[in-house]
Amino acid sequence: MTGSTLLRAIVAAGVLALTGSLVQAQDKTFKLALQNPKGHPLVTGAEKFAELVAAKSGGKIKVSVFPGGTLGGDAQTVSASQGGTIEFVLLNSGILASQVKDFEVYDFPFMFANAKEADTVVDGPFGQKLHGKLADKGLVGLAYFELGFRNMTNSKRPITTVDDIAGLKLRVIPNAINVDWVKALGANPTPLAFPELYAALEQKAVDGQENPLSVILANKFFEVQKHLALTNHQYNPQSLIFSKKVWDTLSPGDRKILQDAAAEASKFQRQVNRDKAAGDLDQLKKNGMQVTELSAAELAKFRDKMKPVIAKHSEVVGADTVKALEAELSKLRK
C-alpha cells in the first residue's frame, strides 16, 4: 500500500466513524399512542414517561404522546407498532391476547383481589415472562401501567343484584373472554373499539359499558349513563409496548433509557390512578350518576357465574400459564 493509498484509507475510515457517531447522536422522536383523553391517569403516566426519557437522554430522545385514540384503535396501533410506524403503544394488556394467547389471563374476572396482588404479579417473573413472549410478534414489552378495577354503567336501571344485569346490551372489549363473561350474566355483549363507545352510548346502540372510574369520568360517560354499579369485577393492567423493528436499531444505552423511564413512570402512574379514585367517584356522583353496590351475597353469585367462563378460557390460555399465575397468587394469600 502506497503512502497516498494509506492516507485515503485512514481518511475514509475516519469519515465512516464520524458518520456513525453523528447518526448515533441524532435526535430521535417517537410516537406513543393510547386511547384515553388528556387528563386521564394513563395520559398523565405517558406524559411522565416522555419527561423521563427526555431527561435521561439529555433531550436526544423525544416521545410525543397521542391520546384519545387519535392514531387509531388498539388493533390499528399495535399493527402500526409491529410495522415500525408507531413506536410506543399503551393499551389494555388483555388485548394482546390477539398476539399471544397467554395475555387473556389478565382478563379473567375477579383474578386479583387488590392492587398489591396485581403489582406483585405484573412486576415479578410472571408479568415479565408474558411481556417477553411479545418479541416473536414484533413487539417489546417495557412495563405495566394500570387502568384499574372495572365497574358497570348503564342507562336503563340501577344494578343491585346480578339478575339486574340480565338483558342489558353491554359494550365489551373485543375479545372472546369478555364476550363470554357478559353472556354468562344473561346480558348481550357488543364488542366495540373504545373510540366508538361514547357515540354508541349516546345513540343508545348499547345500554351500558364497564370500565374503571377514571375512564368513566375522563370520557364523560356520565353525560350518557345514569347508573353506576361498583362491581370491581376485573383488574386491567396496561402494557407499554415498543416496536421491535425500531428497538433492534437502538443502542444498548438508548434501550436502557427507555427501560428505566418505563419502570419509573409505571410506578408513578399507578399511584396517581389510585390516589385519584375516591375523588373520581365523588365527581361522578356530583355529575348525577346514581351509584349502587352489590352485597357480599350478590358478589358471590357473580363469582359463581364466572367459574365456567374461567374454566373454558383456562384451556385456551394454557394450563401452564394459568397454574403459574395461581401459584403466584397463592403465595401472596398465605
Residue spans for each PLM region:
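Bacterial N-terminal signal peptides that target proteins for export
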Residues: 1-11
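Short, flexible helical or helix-coil boundary motifs
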Residues: 14-17, 332
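N-terminal secretory/targeting leader peptides
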Residues: 26-117, 125-128, 132-334
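Sec/Tat signal peptide C-region and signal peptidase I cleavage site
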Residues: 18-25
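Cleavable N-terminal signal peptides
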Residues: 12-13, 23
